[in-house]
């Protein structure tokens, strides 16, 4: 992988979820440095909406994809927000 590659998160982890990033979300590697097995990844939303997060993600938790669709991130974010409102507990929620 390298800077500007499009990637998808392939696991659900609490460390990513605390920043609003969940399995299936798509982003792009926004820094050329590969640090301690991680890439800095930006997870955008569509248009003028604020980005979900820019966080370090382990390379093993990513897969490279050809094209990134920010609408996927908005859909996943909405699912988690809806589940959180309904139960207040996301520990058993899966995408």
Regions found by a protein language model. Give the residues of each.
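Basic/aromatic-rich interaction segments and small domains that mediate binding to polyanionic partners
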Residues: 2-64, 68-69, 95
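Long, low-complexity intrinsically disordered regions
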Residues: 67-95
